[in-house]
Amino acid sequence: MSGVAEPVLSFAIARNAIMDSCSLKSSGFSQWLLLGLLLVFTLVWFSNLEYRKLANPDEGRYAEIPREMVLSGDWVTPRLNDLKYFEKPPLQYWATAAAFRVFGESHWAARWWPATTSFGCVLLMFWAGRRLFGGEIGLAAAAALGGCTGFVINAHVNTLDAGLAAFLTVGLLGFLLAQRPGATPTENRNWMLVVWAAMALAVVSKGLIGVVLPGAVLAIYLLIERDWRLLTRLHFGKGLALFLLIAVPWFVAVSLANDEFARFFFIHEHFARFLTKVHHREGAWWYFIPILLFGAMPWLPFIAVQLRDGWRREGEPGTLQSRRLLLIWAAFIFLFFSVSGSKLPSYILPVFPALALFAAMEMQRMAPATLSHIAWGLAATGGVLLLVVLVGGARIAHMFSKESSPFEIVRNVVPWIGASIFVFTAGAVVAAWSFRRHGRSVGIVALALGSLGAGILALGGYDELSRLSSSYSLVREIEARQGPFDRTLPFYSVQMYDQTLPFYLKRPVTLVQYIDEFALGLDAEPDKGIQRVEDWKKRWAALDQGYAILSPSNYEQIAAGGLPMRVLARDPRRVIVSRR
């Protein structure tokens, strides 16, 4: 029942929001048809949160920290593998831990926060876009965001970036609503307070980036526009007080409980992460270009045209230049992370809501015949890709196969990719036909639903790799044969750490000659790790019974030395053994 509760509740909230808003007669949708589409969107959006196993590294990490919070009752000091872990603030940990307490530990409860905050982001795009630019653009922007490949994929993966992007989007849209021409003083004040609160929640989601990004965008906008009167409409006094009230308490509490927190969090996790390669997540200067191009699909053709025209001045002098602000937002965030010493694909997620608005504006400007031509082009591209997968899927799978990713596993992804491309192509065909027969909005929604369905299927395909990316199957295989692991016995993780293992074992493991992100935690509690493999071997040999996980190559090397180990289960990347 718990897996059903979330989409039902989300749909009910969304339904009330839409029924309270205006009808969209001009878009070709009645309220009831719109609600029907919303129901379909909701069901598809939340359909596979439970189905997929948690994947390394982020999904395991950000499920295990909340699990340990619930177990320990300590909601101030985050712990990973029972070691202090200060890399990120706790908002998502709290939300996930709350879901675990109410509904129990499950895949969907681990993923509910990114999925739900992103879902809310789509609904907000509909409501705010309608108020800012008109009903049809509001619907088109929501559809574009809900069917944006990069946004959809990140919304369904348990990382912190989806929640961060959602709060930054609330701040961006709130700012546009607060400063729009015609906003009353009361509206300006209330929406600016929403902006300050959203920035605070972004900070408690992922750190100072939650205020650095919007602050820098505003500074650049002011320097370009020289609209200094805008500063008088930011409500610094009340806004800053609200920001501090939301953002500061946890930082104070965790600092009082842990002397080492402030230096590690603010220096190591912010300045060192941006300026150096200490986190080993470096990439070339062009790292985010293919991610942006792929992530913006299928709306890239519309975005490209609008970006070209987005710098044009609109309205009276002294009024907010919304399109310029959106362009600065997208460009700055993209460039900021491109020059950073730490790069991951999800870092540019906050760019996509702004791009969705650009796509919506351009689609409302284009003639239906032009939209139809573009949709046919997308359908043709999908058809070619589908043909490539059907004809050469096995060869493609061989290209991505290696010893640690065997062909026998990788090939199982191919049917899912084929189904994903087929659904996208079908959506594009329906959109191309609808643009001519039923107008813009019907075609846009068809294209969005096709893209959303394609993204969900692609994620399902990734789950075929779970024997490589997750310890779920290994743990379940062993437990099916011998029952649950005895939690009173030691479990060692030798020169490796699988982020998903503690979550599925429901217990921490003892790290052997492994530090990585646990340096701070092991410095604080060195007795929870073993520094050298040789020391572990002596301890292992003296045991009556215990468990360990090793890489296959490490296992072969140690087993060749005569250390007694019995293989319980293995896959291409992990071997779990017992002492006897």
Regions found by a protein language model. Give the residues of each.
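Membrane-integral, polyisoprenol-dependent glycosyltransferases
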Residues: 11-13, 18-372, 502
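Membrane-embedded architecture of ER/inner-membrane glycosylation machinery
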Residues: 20-24, 193-197, 306-580
